[in-house]
Amino acid sequence: MNTSAEYTESISQQMSPYSAYRREQMSLSYLNLFNSGIFAATPLRFSLGLTGNLGGMSTTADPDAVQGTWSKAADNAIRANFSLNWLLSKPWITNLELNGSLSYSDKESEERTFNSSAINKTILHGREAGYYIAVPYSGGDVPPVMYIPGGYWYNIMSDDDRPLTTKLSLKANHSHFIGKANNKIKIGADWSTDRNFGIGAYSTEMETAPTFREYRYCDLPTMHNAGAYIEDNVMIPAGKGRINLIAGLRSDNTLIKGSDYGLTSSLSPRFNAKYTILPRQGRERKTVRELSVRASWGEAVKLPSFAMLFPMPTYRDIRVFTSTTNSSNISYDAYYIQPRSVQYNPDLKWQRNRMMEIGLETNILGNKISLTAFRNRTLNSYRISSHYDRTTYSYTSDAGLANLAIPADDRVFAVDASSGIVTVSDRTGKLPSEVLPHETYKEFAPSYYPDNEINPIDRYGIEWVVDFAKIKALQTEVRVDGSWYSYKSLGLNLLEYSPVASHAAGTNLPYNLIGHYIGGNAYSNGSETKTLRTNITITTHIPKVRMIVSAKLEASLLKYSRTLSEDASGAELARTINDISDILSLSNKSIYATDSYVVRFPETYCTYDDPTPRNYLSALEAAKASGDINLYNDLWQLAYKSNVLYTFRKDYVSPYFSANFSVTKEIGDLASISFYANNFFVNRAQIWSSKTETYMTAASYIPRFYYGLTLRLKF
């Protein structure tokens, strides 16, 4: 049995300890081997572990923030695990393994904020569809729409997050020889569950709480994941070397009660081959002490996330009425609340990642070298797309208040929850109630659904690791590792977009056009990047004082990126313009070959009343030629114009560096203490961007300086 205790403290601001992370952890482990009695011929190894920690992040001592504000987040957890390994040594099974684990966390966070408003502030909490007018909070049930009186106030918001994860796995191994070849077969299954016992966002001060909707994590269903796999591992002698072949197949299944997708399932195959040309045995004095080559291919299927399978509800809040302000400086807003959620897509395909890799591993005079080239292609990558539903709602303007006989201070406003009609009554009862005139507005309402990107995403690169032979006189090891990486992504889906927050030109009516864009409503629909990074790690052991000192230098030698705007054939989607004030002053210049202002048009558009797609550019030119200013301005809102000349310029960022440092000291056999500091030299150097032709701080590319101390006690 072993016991250990650990204390960790990490501070992110060296000038003031106002933001710090602290954690106390204790662990207990038990291991036993049963090899007598009924287990004499088939020994059973049993292990049990229990770990718990208390701690979290706190900003309670910040002297520079607004007085009285603070935030803190708990990091409390308890984890348990067990393992049974039964060596059966039967002709049909070699050993059987059973593993299980449980992890429960308390990650509740709290934040106290300062707020102020010159007039009353409208707050929304409603989750049911309908029309609601703001009322003051008077305790008890929270109104769908309420207001906080003008002034200043503090509020504490909390998020109760208590996830529980359980896992159980069973694996059987069978090892046997086929001639001189060693064949190992592995069959296994695993099951895991995820659920949450927290209540989500809440406030004990609802009279001053900001806009939020109750979403109780504890009411969500449990996510069950079950998997099964089989793997065959064959080791075949080949001359002085050997060939290792591994083939495997895995099935994953996810089930969430109440999900429209029901049971989701997938199959993921893989194959590895390794040829050890020169094995390590007997070559300790040779120049090349080991040499092997390897290759692998596999396909990993990613099932949809919980958020896709059981989406969180969202809400669209439309202000449909604003009253006059009375002598107490209070006005009343009415809102139309539309609950929305990510919709079910019966045509959704599972995302697949196809991986290919070749590598070489060698040992030359004690220097271990590994070189790997890889290519990954992601198919059917997940994305959230949108389409627009045609909706109507009742809107009441403030024009109807001008001729109202009821004095402003005596007006009591009410709205019908289903029709949206606003009625004004007299608080004193002297004057009759009046119904305000209203209009029916037509508007597009966005709906979101999980979708697949039709164009694959390609990643490829080279990785290397060199572990130099140990410098015995200094007890020092040096490692150099790095990578060259290339990435290209191009969105080719035809997507809808409408600026629903805007108004139609020349009116106060909702905007009523939809644009259709290849890859989305932006200048670009993709990007490409190339990076070259390398790291040097030096680790020195000082046995006499039982100390380990480690320093790591991280370097970015190449960082290239470029924004893309093109279709599947390579034709450019964005257009260069000669005059930034005229989006129709099109030129024939390439967006990549010159520095110019650019504009992106939708391919087609449609209206609320007519869903037939129409050519956008032709309609824009016709509206300008005919002098239809309102239509021109409406169409203009669907175009995206750059305000800089370098939108599609190549961006090379100059090299930058960061250093990390750590020291670990053993104190007897009972304790160890570690100090670490990331970005140890607090690199604030300026780096150059060829795209913007400006210098910028390296702080946006490397981690902030932070340091910490860890104390471990072992029993």
Question: Can you annotate each of these PLM segments?
Answer:
Residues M1, Y7, R22-L28, N76-F82, ...:
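Hydrophobic, lipid-facing positions within transmembrane beta-strands of outer-membrane proteins
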Residues N2, F34-F46, G56, S89-L96, ...:
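Repeated loop/turn-to-beta-strand initiation elements of outer-membrane beta-barrel proteins
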Residues A5-I11, L50-G56, L102-E108, W191-F197, ...:
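Transmembrane beta-strands of outer-membrane beta-barrel pores
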Residues N32-G55, S71-D260:
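Face-selective signature of the C-terminal outer-membrane beta-barrel domain
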Residues N99-S101, R294, R319, N326-S447:
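Membrane-embedded beta-barrel scaffold of Gram-negative outer-membrane proteins
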Residues D219-K368, T372-R377:
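Structural signature of Gram-negative outer-membrane beta-barrels, strongest in the C-terminal barrel
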Residues A238-K240, S394-D579:
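Gram-negative outer-membrane beta-barrel transporters
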Residues K286, T378-N380, Y395, A555-S642, ...:
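C-terminal beta-signal and adjacent terminal beta-strands/loops
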